[in-house]
Regions:
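Beta1/beta-strand and adjacent pyrophosphate-binding region of the FAD-binding site
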Residues: 2-14
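N-terminal FAD cofactor-binding segment of flavoenzymes
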Residues: 20-82, 394-402
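Predominantly flavin-linked oxidoreductase catalytic cores and closely associated redox partners
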Residues: 112-286, 291, 295-306, 310-311
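Helical element adjacent to the flavin cofactor pocket in flavoenzyme catalytic cores
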Residues: 99-118
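Internal hydrophobic alpha-helix adjacent to the cofactor/substrate pocket in enzyme cavities
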Residues: 369-391
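A glycine-rich dinucleotide-binding beta-alpha-beta segment and adjacent secondary-structure elements
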Residues: 297-363, 370-372, 390-407, 412-418, ...
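C-terminal auxiliary extensions adjacent to catalytic cores
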Residues: 415-458
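Dinucleotide-binding Rossmann-like beta1-alpha1 core, especially the glycine-rich loop
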Residues: 50-60, 85-101, 105
């Protein structure tokens, strides 16, 4: 047992993973959880690490992004992966769990740990006098959200997540897609997907009639500055909100055949090199990372079901065989403007004793949140020991996620594990087969991650 003491706010995936790791190092952890005194609109049980959406923790294969992330987590000593084994249910090549069993096992592990003291109460003030980890999740609200806003600047804390889909660069059809800026001004920073009239009309019809995902109650409530959607496909207009600054592309399509052509799909200032003429409409793709291995579909914030996104957005010229690494979502989501306020050590740049972990940082997904908890815990422990922990190498999944989180990005949005954020292999070492290529990338990542662990073993 050490004399170190750390406060952790939130007993979700990130908070529990961090608390268990720190406790294993002999740190006295004060873990605060607001349930059962206060429940968010999404949470129903009193247990820790409650899974509120899917019960899948995604693929286990090493040559998949989620499988690679799990391998890195195992090497860091993940306790939640042990709990997942206890709660495992059959799911083919994926790791899926009985959510009640999983939560019960994590709760048992936390409550059985002598170095963790659980406080079932809501915290509204952040005490910076000692290291504190905020892992309160994407539904953080009330006085604590105000406190975070005070520390980060209110404009650096987002309360609504409107995300466009992201595709891999290597899956695009460059016979159709071309690089250009409007009127050839400046660098050709965007890729362009030009429509002719027939292609656009077919795309518009498919988009306007596509099936939308149901909104959770906590996503659908009216927010300041929101307007009711008058065409909500059967949903009550007073329960569905449309944000003019991030309007779903399908609602724009429903407003008229030409609405998109005078909005995000406007073709002005562009020439299709195949025809020598201005396209009827044009979709732009913007690089999501410096390596330009990922592109987001500009202006395509959406609430379509994921299968519908794949079907409809694959009608965009050049995206017929696109690999989607993230589908668009629109939901209530409290997260930091991480590139501006968060260091690579997952603490605030201006308040270094205040650490963050989980989805509130911009790590998107169950296992990503847990991995973020492990990384934050290691950084906190290094700080207690008077050391600074370097971020994992960028050719590892954890390192690539940290780099994404902390690299300047005017359009920052949460990101989950995907192979597209990892640096590509050198051309002479790149297998043509995608499965073999991903395996080679994963093996490189594991070796690099293991070396990082050995060099920073404290």
């Amino acid at each position: 047992m050490s004399n170190y003491k750390v406060t952790v706010l939130g007993a979700g995936l990130a908070g529990c993973e961090a608390a268990l790791w720190l406790a294993g190092k002999g740190v006295q952890v004060e873990l605060y959880e607001q349930k059962p005194a206060h429940f968010s609109p999404a949470h129903k049980s009193e247990g820790f690490a409650e899974l509120i959406c899917s019960n899948s923790l995604k693929a286990e294969r090493l040559d998949s992004a989620s499988g690679l992330l799990k391998e890195e987590m195992r090497r860091m000593g993940s306790q939640l992966l042990n709990a997942a084994e206890v709660a495992r249910v059959a799911a083919g090549g994926a790791l899926a769990v009985d959510r009640d069993t999983f939560s019960a096992e994590v709760t048992r592990m936390v409550e059985a740990e002598p170095n963790i003291t659980v406080h079932r109460e809501r915290v509204e003030h952040i005490d910076e006098s000692a290291p504190i980890l905020v892992a309160t999740g994407p539904l953080t609200d009330g006085a604590l959200a105000d406190e975070i806003g005070r520390l980060t600047g209110d404009e650096r804390l987002h309360f609504y997540d409107a995300v466009a889909p992201i595709v891999t660069a290597e899956s695009l059809d460059y016979e159709k897609v071309f690089a250009a800026s409007r009127y050839d001004r400046g660098e050709a920073d965007y890729l362009n997907c030009p429509f002719n009239k027939a292609e656009y009309e077919a795309f518009h019809a498919a988009l306007a009639s596509a099936e939308r995902a149901p909104l959770h109650e906590f996503d659908a409530g009216a927010e300041q500055g929101a307007q009711p959607d008058p065409d909500a496909h059967g949903k009550k207009a007073d329960t569905v909100t449309v944000y003019e600054g991030c309007m779903p592309i399908e609602i724009m399509a429903a407003r008229g055949a030409d609405t998109m052509r005078f909005g995000p799909l406007r073709p002005v200032g562009l020439i299709d090199p195949r025809t020598g003429h201005r396209p009827w409409a044009n979709v732009q793709l913007r690089a999501e990372n410096k390596e330009r291995t990922l592109y987001n579909i500009v202006g395509f914030q959406t609430n379509l079901k994921w299968g519908e996104q794949k079907r409809v957005f694959s009608m965009i010229p050049g995206l017929e065989n696109a690999e989607f690494v993230r589908y668009g979502v629109m939901h209530r989501n409290t997260f930091l403007d991480a590139p501006r306020v968060l260091s690579a050590g997952l603490c605030l740049k201006e308040h270094p004793n205040v650490f963050f972990a989980g989805q509130i940082t911009g790590f998107e997904g169950y296992m990503e949140s847990a991995a973020c908890g492990l990384l934050a815990a290691r950084n906190i422990y290094a700080r207690l020991e008077g050391k600074e922990l370097p971020a994992p190498p960028i050719d590892t999944m954890c390192g690539a996620l940290i780099q994404y989180l902390t690299t300047e990005n005017r359009h920052f949005q949460p990101m989950g594990a995907n192979m597209g954020i990892l640096p590509p292999l050198p051309e002479d070492q790149r297998p043509r087969d995608k499965r073999l290529r991903y395996m080679a990338v994963a093996e490189r990542a594991v070796a690099s991650f293991q070396q990082w662990l050995e060099e920073n073993n404290f």
